[in-house]
Amino acid sequence: RIGGTIDRMDSKEGTLRIVDYKTGGSPKVPANIEQLFTPAEGRPNYIFQTFLYAAIMARQQALKVAPSLLYIHRAASESYSPVIEIGEARKPKLPVDDFSVYEDEFRERLLKLLEEIYDDKEEFTQTEDTKKCEYCDFKAMCKR
């Protein structure tokens, strides 16, 4: 079972904005959708989570969906924007103000990930970083 809670949704001018509040950390800019699925330190997990919410909501209603991350500690800055951006380093970034642009690629990659997770031929490997185990729901299952 996969679950989660969308912190806030609001609609304005034909767009449903999915807002995920963050109390720590800093905004990250993935180079592309694939980076959301590539295990690495500093991976933009928050964006993955918000895109997952956007993918669900995009199928449940007709409005354009715009996922966003609101970093509370940065919100007072006049230059801050909660809009998620995607783009290569040292190149112009593209705001994700319409999830449908990325939806097919995200869903395709998500399906591939789920197939890998549920493939009984795929061996489970524990992470080497035991700090990740502190809040993991499955630590008892893998004996950590």
Model-based region annotation:
Residues R1-R144:
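RecB-family 4Fe-4S metal-dependent nuclease core
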